[in-house]
Amino acid sequence: MQIIYLYSEGDGWDMAYFPMYINLEGKKVIVVGGGKAALRKINSLLYFGAKIAVIAPKVCDEIKAIKGINVHESNVALDILQNADIVVAATRRADINDKIGNYCKAQGIMVNVADNRELSSFLFPGVIVRGDLVVGVTTGGNSQAVSKQIRNMIDRMIPEEYDVLTRKMGAYTELANVNIKSPALREEALDELVKVALSNKCVLDDKKANKVLDKYYREDAARRNSQ
């Protein structure tokens, strides 16, 4: 994966956002805000298993209807945020969002501040999900419209069958890791399995897959025996 540095004349070097994927299962997330912006963030986070608490004086009915989250209709006290792994500031007031962002940064808490990427320690990407296959798209906060268009383009390119293919490849990768000692041969074997699937509309037939793996098992064993 490549980290790209972009030069901005007069401002020195700015680093593009690194696309790091985080396991959110069971993570405590506090969303401050009860409107449409907060709703979009909540829907994104909830899919990935986060434990979400929403704090706002007024919370929209759509958020209240979401199962599995805690809703507190009150003003937020900053010290409550210390209990969170991640904080999302998505109120309608920029001054409150900025206050939350500054507090979280001072406390070392990951925070996303609506409409303020300078205060945000992470951004919400446009997401395409096919089971365990997750693709995120971001323009570094420059243009949500561009990010949305690219997300939709990629979404059309990736068929639903990739969900099953990804899970199958996970199982075959485990087999290859155990039975093919050569990293180079193992990579060749797994690449060939994907090519076989793509030639068959993303369907990986078990019989064909085992035939491919058996070929590489034998080649790997022969190489080791000759040493």
Regions found by a protein language model. Name each.
Residues 26, 82-83, 130:
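Alpha-helix C-terminal capping/helix-to-coil transition sites in glycosyltransferase folds
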Residues 113-162:
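E1/E1-like adenylate-forming module used to activate ubiquitin-like modifiers
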Residues 4-58, 63-64:
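Hydrophobic, well-ordered beta-alpha structural blocks that scaffold small-molecule cofactor pockets
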Residues 35-37, 95, 141:
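Residue-level detector of alpha-helix initiation sites
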Residues 67-82:
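Glycine-rich, highly charged phosphate/nucleotide-binding loops
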Residues 86-90, 97-123:
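ADP-ribose/adenylate-binding Rossmann-like module
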Residues 141-227:
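An accessory alpha-helical subdomain
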